[in-house]
């Protein structure tokens, strides 16, 4: 007879008959303690992940509205959304296995940014470096390297953009078309594909528009490996987003 077995028997004799103790043997107590330890460990892991996310998100380019975006809180109302969710989640889960880029194209407000951010957030928690940047910000930073006061050269910036595990370029096609923009995007995609690094693109343009804007060479490189081209064809639900859903 163990100490705890005797303890529980004495406790039951002292307690009123209408009160039943939570545990009446040492096996149940041990199992409860182990379960509490497991829950505590999971809580600590979640907190550590949240802290890591907060530290990294300041450098990832993911906007505040999308910081909590995940595959779990992506709203599904029809098969089209179910399809892009499944493909995006599989892309993130299989990221280490091969080189694969993605293009999310379609109407504004259809969830392209949500799923791109969900991919980024997932990869951050799995130790990957990601950067989400708009074409406007990208070109602004590039042109900023021309100023005499900048310590960063165009080559330095191109190197940094080519070094992150996943670079996602948003709002492709929103800017006034320029030859310099085409050259820079071409260089970035070329460098990244040559070093087996993945690139993501988000655009309101369709396949024909993307090909016309970026050229066959860039589109061809964006299709290397098990790359994705997902089309978001449904109506915008951005008007229903209040900002507190995530």
From Swiss-Prot:
Where is the signal peptide, in residue numbers?
A: none
Q: Which keywords annotate this record?
A: ATP-binding, DNA replication, DNA-binding, Hydrolase, Nucleotide-binding, Primosome
Write down the superkingdom of origin. Bacteria
- List the catalysed reactions: ATP + H2O = ADP + phosphate + H(+)
Q: Which GO terms describe its biological process?
A: DNA replication, synthesis of primer
GO molecular function terms attached to this record: ATP binding; DNA binding; hydrolase activity
Q: What is its EC number?
A: 3.6.4.-
Q: Provide GO CC annotations from the record.
A: primosome complex
InterPro entries the UniProt entry points to? DNAC/IstB-like, IstB_ATP-bd, P-loop_NTPase
Site entry: Probably involved in the interaction with the DnaB protein: 69
Name the NCBIfam families for this protein. PRK07952.1
Q: What does this protein do?
A: Required to load the replicative helix DnaB onto single-stranded (ss)DNA, to initiate chromosomal replication. DnaC alters the inter-domain and inter-subunit interactions of DnaB, inducing an open ring conformation that allows ssDNA to access the interior of the DnaB(6):DnaC(6) ring. Has ATPase activity only in the presence of DnaB and ssDNA. ssDNA binds to the central pore in the DnaB(6):DnaC(6) complex, making contacts with both subunits.
The entry describes its oligomerization and partners as:
The helix loader is a DnaB(6):DnaC(6) complex with a crack opening large enough to allow ssDNA into the central cavity.
Its family?
Belongs to the DnaC family.
Stated name of the protein = Replicative helicase loader DnaC
């Amino acid at each position: 007879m163990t100490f705890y077995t005797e303890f529980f028997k004495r406790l039951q004799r002292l307690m009123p008959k209408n009160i039943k103790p939570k545990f009446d043997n040492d096996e149940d107590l041990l199992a409860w303690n182990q379960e509490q330890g497991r829950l505590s460990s999971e809580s600590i892991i979640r907190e550590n992940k949240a802290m890591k996310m907060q530290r990294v998100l300041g450098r990832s380019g993911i906007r505040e509205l999308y910081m909590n975006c995940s595959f779990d809180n992506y709203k599904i109302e029809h098969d089209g959304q179910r399809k892009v969710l499944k493909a995006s989640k599989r892309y993130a889960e299989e990221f280490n296995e091969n080189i694969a880029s993605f293009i999310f194209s379609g109407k504004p407000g259809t969830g392209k940014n949500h799923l791109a951010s969900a991919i980024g957030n997932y990869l951050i928690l799995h130790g990957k470096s990601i950067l989400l940047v708009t074409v406007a910000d990208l070109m602004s930073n590039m042109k900023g390297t021309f100023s005499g006061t900048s310590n960063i050269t165009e080559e330095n910036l191109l190197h940094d953009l080519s070094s992150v595990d996943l670079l996602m370029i948003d709002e492709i096609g929103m800017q006034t078309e320029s030859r310099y923009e085409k050259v820079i995007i071409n260089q970035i995609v070329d460098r990244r594909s040559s070093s087996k690094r993945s690139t993501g693109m988000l655009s309101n343009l369709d396949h024909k528009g993307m090909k016309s804007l970026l050229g066959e060479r860039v589109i061809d490189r964006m299709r290397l490996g098990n790359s994705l081209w997902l089309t978001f064809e449904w109506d915008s639900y951005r008007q229903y987003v209040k900002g507190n859903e995530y």
